[in-house]
């Protein structure tokens, strides 16, 4: 099975995986509206991959089979200042 990966034109480091290139039939319209114009990054055979960047390959495969798409959002940014203040015992 091939998988097409698109990056968002509106949200940084946000990617949409779909089963077929340029086929967004299974993706909710509200998600597409927030995602912006999908920009193709790559197409690859997902069955031959053992890992992906930050996404769990098993979750991606399962989502593609069940929902027809997988949305990868960036991990939350760590607030180093807040963490440092907490370690020092400083409260707001």
From Swiss-Prot:
InterPro entries: YcgL-like_sf, YcgL_dom. It comes from the Bacteria. Signal peptide: none annotated. Residues 1-85 form the YcgL domain. SUPFAM superfamilies: YcgL-like. HAMAP family: UPF0745. This is YcgL domain-containing protein SO_2575. It comes from Shewanella oneidensis (strain ATCC 700550 / JCM 31522 / CIP 106686 / LMG 19005 / NCIMB 14063 / MR-1).
